Amino acid sequence: MYTGIVQATCALSFVERKPNLLQFGFCLPETLSADVTLGASIAVNGCCFTVTSMARSVQGLNVTFDAIDETQAITNVKHFEQGTVVNVERSAKQNAEVGGHVLSGHIVGTAELVSIEKDENRCRMTFGSDAPWLKYVFEKGYIAVNGASLTVAALDRSAQTFAINLIPETLERTNFSLLSVGDPVNIEVESQTQVIVDTVERVMAERYAQAD
């Protein structure tokens, strides 16, 4: 479980592509490296990954992860290169404060950044997707973008876009400031909303079937 509060941004130290597998790694800062063990779960751009190897260094803890084909297909992991900056969050501990909203680290797909509007104290980013998961997105509802818990500021279902507002603090602590138009971001929809929408759709379908 994660909270959607990005704890660090890390630059990938290596990316290695193998048959049906992508391996990547980065140096986890000392502030986040306590109690990390092999098999630990860490969210990278919001996607839950398992630590497959680790080694101490002067800078911190070098950790390595594996991404199989399925993970690459539905996330922005397939675009990783050495030097790519990613959002990182350790899994939440019991009784930890949930500063954002509860996340599983299970990505439903990606959205494309279609526009950026900036002024002195705010940045609005608009994302687009024609994927089925867009039906779970609602104005003023939660959404996780690259692992960051955010509020949907605007939604245009006809254009298949949604917008988020970012304060300077969020831009400073995440990789959003490095995004450009056309970049893909990982999306996790809010789980309770997904359950409600799916339940309503199922009940309505059953009622229509009975009426026929």
Positions of the model-derived regions?
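Conserved loop->alpha-helix
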Residues: 1-212
